[in-house]
């Protein structure tokens, strides 16, 4: 086994004495820092490399702190108006994961960079911490490499806002097989539109 495989196995045993101590100390350290800051290097080099990170120019790691829990509806004094079915304010659950929220915040802060992927690095009772891999699309090392040229194209601007990253795709219900019938055709909306459109063919 290579070194990265050993690191991977260490991270799989998060309840071991060593990892519990490490995660507690790291959470304390991350809480002292700002909610969004640049990390000098990935905390989990094995995971970062599996997600596409390379230790070379053009790659950046940002660490994001996201508050845990559901999403409260942002209305003044709970005044939602309308019908009682839509009066809920407190016990609502956000459709996307906290990881995708972290990616979005990193993408907003670093508007010139492209979000490649992200991974979990720790959590406590109040916060979850994620590290986001960002790429500089105008760096020559990225533009000249055939493996990374794809992310320099304009179509990949703010892919984290449009649910195109790995964490973003998970909440869209995409997949193959009988469990994913509600997104046949590319999205929930496409599936709904096809099922709710009456087609009267000329020859039927």
Curated annotation (Swiss-Prot):
Where does the signal peptide begin and end? none
* Lipid attachment locations (N-myristoyl glycine): 2
Q: Which UniProt keywords apply?
A: Cytoplasm, Diamond-Blackfan anemia, Isopeptide bond, Lipoprotein, Myristate, Phosphoprotein, Ribonucleoprotein, Ribosomal protein, Ubl conjugation
Q: Where in the cell is it found?
A: Cytoplasm
Q: Where is this region: Disordered?
A: 165-186
Q: Which GO terms describe its molecular function?
A: cadherin binding; RNA binding; structural constituent of ribosome
Q: Where is the composition biased (Basic residues)?
A: 169-182
Q: Coiled coil located at which positions?
A: none
Per UniProt, location of the Glycyl lysine isopeptide (Lys-Gly) (interchain with G-Cter in SUMO2) cross-link in this chain: 83
Q: Which residues carry this modification: Phosphoserine?
A: 34, 97, 100
Q: Which InterPro entries match?
A: Rbsml_eL15_core_dom_sf, Ribosomal_eL15, Ribosomal_eL15_CS, Ribosomal_uL23/eL15/eS24_sf
Q: What illness does the record link it to?
A: Diamond-Blackfan anemia 12: A form of Diamond-Blackfan anemia, a congenital non-regenerative hypoplastic anemia that usually presents early in infancy. Diamond-Blackfan anemia is characterized by a moderate to severe macrocytic anemia, erythroblastopenia, and an increased risk of malignancy. 30 to 40% of Diamond-Blackfan anemia patients present with short stature and congenital anomalies, the most frequent being craniofacial (Pierre-Robin syndrome and cleft palate), thumb and urogenital anomalies.
Tell me how this protein assembles: Component of the large ribosomal subunit. Interacts with IFIT1 (via TPR repeats 1-4).
Give the function comment from the record: Component of the large ribosomal subunit. The ribosome is a large ribonucleoprotein complex responsible for the synthesis of proteins in the cell.
What is the protein's given name? Large ribosomal subunit protein eL15
* The organism's taxonomic lineage, starting at the top: Eukaryota, Metazoa, Chordata, Craniata, Vertebrata
